[in-house]
Amino acid sequence: MPAPTRIEKVETFLWDRWLLIKIHCEDGTVGIGEGGVHGWQRPTKTMVETMAVYLEGKDPSNIEHHYQWLYRSSHFMGSVVQGALSAIDIALWDIKGKRLEVPIYDLMGGKTRDRVRCYMHVGGNTKDELVADAVKRAREGFTAVRFTPFARDYYLHKSYAEWADEAVERVGAVKEAVGKGVDICVEIHRQMSPAESIWLGRRLEQFNPFFYEDPMLPDSPARMADVQDQCNIPIATGERFTTIFEFEQLLAANATSYIRPDLCLCGGLSGCKKVAAMAEAKHIKVIPHNPLSPVSTAACVQLDACIPNFALQEYTGESEPPKSDLLVKPLELKDGYLTVPEGPGLGIELNEAALAKPENPKILDTPIGYDGSGQDR
C-alpha cells in the first residue's frame, strides 16, 4: 500500500466550453476531473474553489466522506453544487486508482466488458444533410446514431401537424438510409408537451427506435410515465437529474426504459454507480449522458466497464480540435466501440500545453417562437 498523503491544492481550468479540475496531493499524485453542465461552467468553477478550502489537507482516499460533508454543508442543492461535487469525485477516484496503480473500474467491482458500444451524434439542417451525416457515421463503423428530428428553427413551425410530419419524414429517411444494422436514437430535447410527444411517439413506432429521449420536460415522473405507457417505444431520460433521489422517483414511477445519468452532474462516479445499481433492480439499463470533454468520456468508460446493466455510451466525436488536443493519447475508438483502457485511474493523461486554450463561454440563446414566448431547447 502507498504511504498516506494529503490534498495539497485544487486547480480549476475553464477550457474551451468545459470545466476541468486537478487535485494535487503532497506525494505528487494529480487527479483529473470534470464537472458542470454546458453553459454554467463559470459558477461551477467558483463552487469548486469554495469547496477546495475544505479539501486542502484532507486524505484523498475518503471519497464518500468528502462528498457527504460537502453535500450536507451546502444546504441548498442544484446543478452548480452537484457539478462541483462531481468534478471532485472523479478527480479523487483518479487519485485512488493512480496511487494503487489500477483502473477505477477495478476498484468498483472489476471489469464487466472490454469495450463500450457508442452512439454518435449526427445532424443537419435539412433532411438530406441529416441522412448524409448518418450514412457517413455508419460507414465509420458506428452501429447506433442519435439525432433530433427537427430543423434548427423547429420553434417557428406554424402548426403541430407540420412539425410532427417533418419529424416522421426525417426519422424514416435516416432509418431507410442506414438500414437494420444501425440503431436510431431519437432526441426530442424536451421540446414537446406530453400530449404532443405521445402522438409523435406513436407515429415513430414503425421505425423501431432504440430510444425516444426526453420527449417532455423531466420534472414530472408521473407525466413521463404517461408518455411511456402510451408510446410503444423505449423512453430515455435523466440527463438533468443531479441526485440519486430524483432517479428514485423516476424509477418508482416506471417512467422510463433507460436512465441517462451525467457523471459530471450527478455525483461523479460514486453517484452514478449508485444510480446504476438502483436501475439494475428494475431491469433498466444505463446510457450515460456525455456532451462534455474527453475527460467526461474517460470517466463514463470507467463506469460502463464495471456495471452489468450498461446499454450505450453517448459520444460526440473527439478526433478534431479542440477535443483532439486535450489528451496525450486519446481513448481508442474502433468500429463504433471505445476500448476500455488498462492504465491507472481514468487511464488518461492531459496534454498540459492544451490547457492554455482560452474559454469559449456559452452565449444564452433561448429560442423565441412566433408569439414572442420562450421555447424549450
Model regions: which residues?
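Short glycine-enriched loops at secondary-structure junctions
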Residues: 16, 190-192, 217, 240-243
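Extended hydrophobic packing segments that form well-structured cores
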Residues: 346-377
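Metal-dependent enolase-superfamily TIM-barrel catalytic cores that perform enediolate-based chemistry
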Residues: 115-231
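Glycine-rich, aromatic-flanked loop segments that form ligand/cofactor-binding clefts
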Residues: 89-125, 129
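Metal- or metallocofactor-binding catalytic centers and their adjacent structured scaffolds
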Residues: 24-100
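Conserved, mostly hydrophobic/aromatic
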Residues: 7, 28, 51, 88, ...
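Shared catalytic-loop signature of beta/alpha-barrel
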Residues: 49-53, 62-65, 202, 208-211, ...
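Structured beta-strand/loop patches that form or line metal/cofactor-binding pockets in enzymes
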Residues: 1-32, 36, 318-324, 373, ...
